[in-house]
Amino acid sequence: MEKKKPRTLVEKIWERHVVRRAEGEPDLLYVDLHMVHEVTSPQAFEALRLAGRRVRRPDLTVATMDHNVPTTDVRLGVRDRVSARQMEALRKNCEEFGIQLHEWGSPGQGIVHVIGPEMGLTQPGMVIVCGDSHTSTHGAFGALAFGIGTSEVEHVLATQTIPQRRPKTMAITVEGEAPPDVTAKDIMLGILHRIGTGGGVGHAIEYRGEAIRNLSMEGRMTICNMTIEGGGRAGMVAPDEKTYSYIEGRPHAPKGRAWEEALEYWQSLPTDEGATFDKEVVIDAAELVPYVSWGTTPAQTVPLDGEVPEPQNEGHERALRYMGLRPGTPIREIEVDTVFIGSCTNARIEDLRAAARVLEGHKVKEGIRAMVVPGSMRVKKQAEEEGLDEIFKKAGFEWRNAGCSMCLGMNPDILSPGERCASTSNRNFEGRQGKGGRTHLVSPVVAAATAVMGRFASPSELGVPVEVG
C-alpha cells in the first residue's frame, strides 16, 4: 500500500471541501459558514433578487450589524443617511431571504468576527467566508477562513460554494516563551515587522510554535485577525484542547454524539509530521517586546522603548510627514490625543480585563479622549457583570455599545485631522480612522497605560506588574 503524503492543516481542509475540480480552473469549495454584515451585502442581495434566485442555505448564513452602527445609545438612532440605508437594507434582505440577523443593540449583536466564535458558530475544519478582510480571525480555531468581495458574497448566497485557487502554504513558527510583558498583539506586530506587508501574499499561513500554543483562544484570534496585514490569504492555528474547551457548551456547538464525532474529526486536522510548507519563517519569542506602530502600515513598528526610525525610502518619508513625527524621537515621548480600545482585533473579554487591570486606581490624563468599545453585546454584558465597566468609567473612559467603532471611518467614532490615537485596532493607513487622523497600533495594556500618562507608556510605569496575561 502506498504511504500517504503528509499534509498540512490547510491541505486537509481544502481537500475535504472541493466539490468540483477542473484543469485550468479554480477549485469549487463548499462553504460551511457565511457571515454577512451591512456594508458588503446590499448589492449581493439585490443581484439575487434581480436574477430570481434564493439563498441556498440560509441556515448556514448569519448576519449582524457592525461597521456602520453608532456605539452610543440605540435610542438616539442613526443620523448618517448612507449608514441608515445600509442597515435598513440588511433588515429587509434578511427578512425576505430567511437569514438570522443580530439587530443593532440586540443581545447577540456585535462585530462579525467576535460573535461567530462566541456563539460556537466558528469550528475547526470549516471553510468560513465573509465580505470582510479580517475573516482570517476565525482561523484561530483551525478553520480555513478568508474575506471575499461583494460578487463572491452573491455567489456564496446563491450556491453555498466559492471558486478559489489553492493558496501556497506558509509556516510562521514563534519558538520558545514570550517575555511576560509581551501580548498576542505584540507577537503579531513583531511578525509583521519581520515579514512586511507583502510577506504572506498568496499564502495560507499556519502559526506554530510554543509561543502560539501558549496563547489563549482570544490571543490566537488576535494573531490570525491581522494575517491580511502581512498579505496572507488566511491565517490558522491548529486546534488543540484549548480550542475544544472554548467551543464546548456554546450555543451552536455540537452536542452529545455529534460532539464526539466532531472531536474525532477536529483531532485529525493538525499538520502531519513531515509535511512541508512552501515558505517558512522562524521567530525567537524571547526577542519580542511591546511594540508601537510609527508609520502608516502595520509593519512600520518599533519597540515601545525605541525611537522613530530614520527613513529608509520615500514611503517612509511620506509616512513620517503624514504622522507628524521626527526621526530619533523616543516613542515614550510621543503624546496622544485619543485612546481607543476596541475592534475585531482586541475587544474581547480578556482584552478588556487586561486593560482594566492596568487602569484600576488610575485616571485618564486631562484632555485625553478615551473610549472602550466591546466587540459584542455579550462581551459588554459579561464585562459589566465583572464590574469592568465601572473601572473604565471611574478612570475616565467612555463605555460604549458594541460595534466596529473607531477602527474605521464609517461611523460617528472618527478622528479629526491631525488627531493622534493609540489604537488597539489592526490598521493604521492614512485616513483609516478619519481624514487626517494619525493612528498608532498598540496592545490593550499599552493603550490603557498611554491613556493615563498621555504619552506612550507601559503598565510598569504605573506600578502594574509586567505579567499581562
From Swiss-Prot:
Q: What does this protein do?
A: Catalyzes the isomerization between 2-isopropylmalate and 3-isopropylmalate, via the formation of 2-isopropylmaleate.
What taxonomic lineage is listed for the species of origin? Answer: Bacteria, Bacillati, Actinomycetota, Rubrobacteria, Rubrobacterales
| Coiled-coil portions | none
Q: Name one GO biological process term.
A: L-leucine biosynthetic process
Keywords from the named record: 4Fe-4S, Amino-acid biosynthesis, Branched-chain amino acid biosynthesis, Iron, Iron-sulfur, Leucine biosynthesis, Lyase, Metal-binding
Q: Which InterPro entries match?
A: 3-IsopropMal_deHydase_lsu (IPR004430), Acnase/IPM_dHydase_lsu_aba_1/3 (IPR015931), Acoase/IPM_deHydtase_lsu_aba (IPR001030), Aconitase_4Fe-4S_BS (IPR018136), Aconitase_4Fe-4S_dom (IPR036008), IPM_dehydratase_rel_enz (IPR050067), IPMI_cat (IPR033941)
NCBIfam families membership: leuC, PRK05478.1, PRK12466.1
Name of protein: 3-isopropylmalate dehydratase large subunit 1
Family in the record: Belongs to the aconitase/IPM isomerase family. LeuC type 1 subfamily.
